[in-house]
A protein has these predicted regions:
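Beta1/beta-strand and adjacent pyrophosphate-binding region of the FAD-binding site
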Residues: 121-137, 295-307
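Flexible, glycine-rich terminal cap/loop adjacent to redox cofactors
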Residues: 132, 141, 146-158, 164, ...
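Gly/Ala-rich phosphate-binding loop of Rossmann-like dinucleotide-binding domains
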Residues: 142, 146, 312, 316-317
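Small cofactor-carrier domains centered on a conserved lysine used for covalent cofactor attachment
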Residues: 2-83, 153
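FAD-site-proximal beta/loop scaffold in flavoenzymes
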Residues: 279-296, 388, 392-460, 552
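Short hydrophobic core segments
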Residues: 130-132, 237, 256-267, 301-302, ...
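Glycine-rich flavin
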Residues: 103-107, 120-121, 125-127, 143-150, ...
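Intrinsically disordered, low-complexity linker and terminal tail regions
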Residues: 1, 78-127, 378-381
Length: 598
């Protein structure tokens, strides 16, 4: 018998990701690719699989631990001579395409399934390119493929294009967050002598406004699809063979589509915890919460990540008494703790209760409401919150990929135990003419990542010699204040032993921030101490997401502190805080007094 270490594989840009569930115990017999622990990032949950079959001899982790790539999860006793299986290399691409390295974001790749034979039936639809899913990544891929001359079909399960993001995600939530921000701003206008009185909320009109915003964007996409001669098909599609898809419409009728190239952009779905009564409409996921069925007097939000906190911001502004419970010891796990503090302080002032290291262990629904019993994250400790009855409960604990819901095995596509589809740096799956993009290929599950991946996949399919070259992917929480970061975080730098310099400019010293009464924020830049190039940055404050792009561009261009500081920023603006942070690092700042080190 041999004992091997099972380690955390490559999980992309994430580090210090908390363990929210241990799925095995010492003595358990596990199969290869069976899940061992579940990790929770800011927007998704990740299940780490076993690299081999065997018996768990020792667990090296417990609930609440934070893990990064390479961390040992368990000691596994395998059969004689057995060892952890190496990650399978992506299938070699055709001779006309240059071979590329596996993506650093791709999950571990299992053995490829044997594809099904072609159906032999006449096709209802034939095309050069089919894109499965019309979210931001999918419609971008379809439009780019059409622009490059490929006869393209775009399949979407919703009646309108845009996927989760436009229909029930990013866009409607930002419309509601704008309304929440206006309510909050009006509430503080009295501080400078302008009193609007208590706002009157007409829920029907607010819902109508949200739907109007969504309609403008989805309608625009439909128009652009027609202009590009992209054929759109509404229905749920699954593979029949490596070159065929079956599409089932809302009326139950099926169509067979035959293609030369395919881009899978089938996205993800909200994780639904098993101990919640999901048949009760008072228990909601993020999609339900965006419907604004009512403004509950009391709302429990389970999960203190980005999605949970954004919806807590909306409902608190609308008048709900909101309670947030988070399993970890900070809100928004994955972000640096200093970024979260201004938000936590403001939520407290607004009356939002936050309970960390707390788990919802039992949930029961009756006529009185939804009663939730809590447990402390640490065994044996008393929970900070007693059993309480709420009008509604929102569960926001991440999203799971849809890789196992599209019949990928019939096309011979590799899908991990968790449901991700591994890809290389050209977004190819192990089947050379099939690509995958967006949430379904791995974290972070962000629309702007999917958009860039979709464009790349379409260009490669059309014959262009390209691969993924972006260094960083930005993250934004549209809370109040907003929290935005890109590149290496302080937490990640510490975990990796990087020698970095950190420079902060407090918005309390910003004329613009003082003028608008929002001085709780700050701008932070992180530099490599050896090269003096910027490798990360973050902003906390109003419009932080809009301000972050300069930092991302600086990282992509390999800028030094001097480059940023010598760029003249308009005054007075919030954006000049980026330049001033660079001056703090460079030691040339005049808008702050920082004693020189002796």
């Amino acid at each position: 018998m041999a004992v091997i270490e099972v380690k955390v594989p490559d999980i992309g840009d994430y580090s210090d990701v908390p363990v929210i569930e241990v799925l095995v115990a010492v003595g358990d017999t596990v199969k290869k690719d069976q899940g061992l622990v579940t990790l929770e990032s800011d927007k998704a949950t990740l299940e780490v699989p076993s690299a081999a079959a065997g018996v768990i001899k020792e667990l090296k982790v417990k609930l609440g631990d934070t893990l990064s790539e390479g961390a040992v999860i368990a000691l596994l006793e395998t059969a004689d001579g057995a060892a952890a299986a190496p990650v399978a290399a992506p299938a070699e691409v055709p001779a006309s395409k240059p071979p590329v390295a596996p993506s650093h974001r791709a999950p571990a790749e299992p053995p490829a399934p044997k594809p099904a034979l072609a159906s032999g039936k006449p096709a209802d639809i034939e095309c050069k390119m089919v894109v499965l899913g019309a979210g931001p990544g999918g419609y971008t891929a379809a439009f780019r493929a059409a622009d490059l001359g490929l006869d393209t079909v775009l399949i979407e399960r919703y009646a309108s294009l845009g996927g989760v993001c436009l229909n029930v995600g990013c866009i409607p939530s930002k419309a509601l967050l704008h309304a929440a921000a206006v309510i909050d701003e009006v509430a503080h206008a009295g501080d400078f002598g302008v009193d609007f009185g208590k706002p009157k909320i007409t829920l029907d009109k607010l819902r109508e406004y949200k739907e109007k915003v969504v309609g403008k964007l989805t309608g625009g996409l439909a128009s652009m699809a027609k202009q590009r001669k992209v054929r759109t098909v509404t229905g749920v599609a699954s593979f029949v063979s490596p070159n065929e898809l079956e599409i089932v419409g809302a009326d139950g009728k099926t169509q067979l589509l035959r293609f030369e190239h395919c881009i899978v952009a089938a996205g993800s779905q909200a994780v639904k915890l098993p101990n919640f009564p999901w048949d009760d409409k008072r228990v909601m996921d993020s999609t339900d919460a965006l419907e604004l069925q009512e403004i509950p007097k009391t709302l429990l939000v389970v999960g203190g990540g980005i999605i949970g906190l954004e919806m807590a911001t909306v409902y608190s502004a609308l008048g709900s008494k909101v309670t947030v419970v988070e399993f970890m010891d900070q809100l928004m796990p994955g972000a640096d703790k200093d970024l979260v503090k201004p938000l936590a302080d403001r939520l407290k002032k607004q009356g939002v209760e936050v309970h960390l290291k707390t788990k919802a262990s039992e949930v029961k629904a009756d006529k009185k409401g939804v009663t939730v019993t809590f447990e402390a994250a640490t065994a044996g400790e008393t929970p900070a919150l007693a059993a309480t009855t709420y009008d509604r409960v929102l569960v926001a604990v991440g999203r799971a990929p849809n890789g196992k819901k599209i019949g990928a095995d019939k096309a011979g596509i590799n899908v991990t135990e968790r449901g991700f589809i591994p890809v290389d740096r050209q977004m190819r799956t192990n089947v050379p003419h099939i690509f995958a993009i967006g949430d379904i290929v791995g974290n972070p599950m962000l629309a702007h990542k999917a958009t860039h991946e979709g464009k790349l996949a379409a260009e490669v399919a059309a014959g262009e010699k390209k691969e993924w070259v972006a260094r960083v992917i930005p993250s934004v929480a549209y809370t109040n204040p907003e929290i935005a970061w890109v590149g290496v975080t302080e937490t990640e730098a510490k975990a990796k032993g990087l020698k970095v310099g950190v420079a902060k400019f407090p918005w309390a010293a910003s004329g613009r921030a003082i003028g608008i009464g929002r001085t709780e924020g700050f701008t932070k830049l992180i530099f490599d101490e050896e090269t003096h190039r910027i490798i990360g940055g973050a902003i906390v404050g109003v419009h932080a997401g809009d301000l972050l792009a300069e930092i991302g561009l600086a990282i992509e261009m390999g800028a030094e502190a001097e480059d940023i500081g010598h760029t003249i920023h308009a005054h007075p603006t919030l954006s000049e805080s980026v330049g001033m942070s660079a001056e703090v690092y460079d030691g040339t700042i005049t808008d702050l007094y920082i004693p020189k080190k002796k």
